[in-house]
A protein has these predicted regions:
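His/Asp/Glu-enriched, well-ordered alpha-helical/loop segment
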Residues: 201-231, 282, 286-288, 308-309, ...
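Divalent metal-coordination and catalytic microenvironments
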Residues: 7, 20, 25, 47, ...
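Short, surface-exposed connector motifs at secondary-structure boundaries
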Residues: 86-90, 116-121, 145-147, 225-234, ...
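C-terminal cap of metal-dependent C-N hydrolases
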Residues: 7, 329-334, 340, 388-454
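Alpha-helix-loop-beta-strand connector modules within alpha/beta enzyme cores
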Residues: 102-118, 166-180
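Histidine-rich, glycine-flanked metal-binding segment
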Residues: 1-3, 8-52
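Metal-associated gating/positioning segment near the N- to mid-region
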Residues: 45-115, 132
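Histidine/acidic residue-rich metal-binding segments in metalloenzymes
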Residues: 132-152, 156-315
């Protein structure tokens, strides 16, 4: 057995001084004191918080986005995730138009199986709605996929409102949840054209062409459609605006149920002034080209306040990494050609812990980045809590560690980090995935114990 001793276990009820024993891939005992037997391994967690492994419910690894392949494979991405304390990702498999969901799922398994340090589950994104996809929803549930995604943006992915309504109705019937990218795509297309024709070609044009109204309108539309479908469960992903937040508040005030809200560190910590960053070649602002874009400082403040108040359920990353040099720089003369996305899977826990120091305690960090993702996506209580019989995914966290985030020392396979120079408070001292030590002091051990997580 592996026994974690002298730590403070993070539970919904608060910190609990106790020891924890893992045998194989399960937590087998939690007690005030567990004495090791001959052959047991002891992990001293004195001065540390012991979390259930963090869960990132929104990643895009080894993925073609319509412009390019993301920089991180499942191998590099899950290794980076584990180095930060994340023991499970939920990645977006995508059934492009003309591709069936079973074929898409098989392809994502081919990319991920046997290569992962952290565990992985899959959402299934639908780029079209037809009778074959309707019939295959149940097959996806049987294959362990209980969450799906549709888009209101991107011409090659977007469903119309009637199709979205039908997806919501079907998922409510089979017990699934729909995650939705909420931007008004036709409006974005028009505004991109207008901004470019005004002579704005640099990264700042990205944010100008995707204003807060594009998100808020789509959030409101989604919630009305979900209500029409009998309050079908929906997850509003990567919420970035105050207006979008107000649309969610309005729906909840009407009494609508089954609304879940996700945001990301970038929308809680950065703002749209980043697009003016020049760097050595005058193009550093492209690092922050992601969709939705970084917003005004007022949006950031509103989301931070809502997070602390408990109005946001989960913090994910939307990790979708592209190199600045060789990928993003192909849009040097046209912001519309910059691949959308950025890295974040490695630094999410420490970024949130540090940025909200004094506002969010360890119980809150656990709720937002472990327990709630497990609940929303059908993994709780197997994951998302420290309990006898739960999976042995555990992060021993040293809150006293101090270090600086640098692209040169990160494990994400990308040539920059949006958090360059960030003074981080805390670090994953030891990370166990399925009972195997995967990370020691923020560095990988080389083990690849990650498994597929059917839900």
């Amino acid at each position: 057995m592996i026994i974690i001793k002298n730590g403070a276990l993070v539970t919904p009820q608060g910190l609990r001084r106790a020891d924890l024993a893992m045998d194989g891939d399960k937590i087998v005992r939690i007690a005030a004191a567990i004495e090791p037997a001959e052959g047991d391994t002891v992990e001293d967690a004195a001065g540390c918080w012991v979390f259930p492994g963090f869960i990132d419910g929104h990643t895009h690894m080894q993925c073609w986005t319509g412009m390019d392949w993301t920089a991180d494979s499942f191998e590099t991405g899950t290794r980076a995730a584990a180095c930060g304390g994340t023991t499970t990702i939920v990645d977006y498999a995508t059934a492009d138009r003309g591709v069936t969901m079973p074929d898409a799922l098989a392809e994502w398994h081919r990319r991920a199986d046997g290569t992962c340090t952290a565990n992985y589950a899959f959402h299934m994104a639908l780029a079209e709605w037809n009778e074959r996809n309707r019939a295959d929803l149940s097959a996806m549930r049987e294959a362990g996929v209980s969450s799906f995604k549709t888009y209101f943006a991107y011409d090659h992915l977007r469903l119309d409102d009637a199709e979205t309504l039908e997806v919501l109705e079907e998922l409510k019937y089979i017990g699934g949840i729909l995650c939705v990218h909420c931007e008004n795509g036709t409006l974005v297309n028009e505004l991109q054209k207008r901004v470019f024709e005004q002579g704005i070609h640099g990264p700042e044009g990205h944010a100008l062409s995707r204003p807060d109204v594009c998100e808020a309108e789509a959030v409101s539309r989604l919630l009305y459609l979900a209500h029409l479908a009998g309050d079908a469960p929906v997850n509003v992903v990567h919420l970035s605006t105050k207006l979008g937040l107000e649309a969610i508040r309005a729906a909840k005030a009407r009494g609508q149920k089954n609304i879940y809200v996700e945001t990301c560190p970038q929308y809680l910590m950065l703002d749209d002034t980043c697009y003016l960053e020049q760097g050595e070649d005058g193009f550093a602002g492209a690092k922050y080209v992601m969709s939705p874009p970084l917003r005004h400082a007022g949006d950031r403040a509103a989301l931070r306040e809502a997070l602390v108040a408990g109005e946001i359920d989960t913090i994910a990353t939307d990790h979708c990494s592209f190199n600045l040099h060789g990928q993003k720089d192909r849009g040097r003369d046209d912001f519309r050609a910059i691949p959308n996305g950025g890295p974040g899977v490695e630094h999410r826990p420490v970024a949130i812990a540090t940025s909200f120091e004094g506002q969010l305690g360890p119980e809150d960090l656990c709720r937002l980045m472990s327990e709630n993702p497990a609940r929303v996506f059908g993994m709780y209580p197997r994951k998302g809590c420290l309990a006898e019989g739960a999976d042995a995914d555990v992060c021993v966290w040293d809150p006293k560690a101090r270090w600086t985030i640098r692209a040169t020392t990160q494990h994400q396979a990308v040539d920059y980090t949006p958090l360059e120079g960030f003074e981080a408070h805390g670090r994953a001292k030891a990370v166990f995935v399925n009972g195997v030590l995967a990370v020691r002091d923020g560095e990988p051990t080389g083990a690849q114990p990650g498994r597929y997580v059917p839900r």
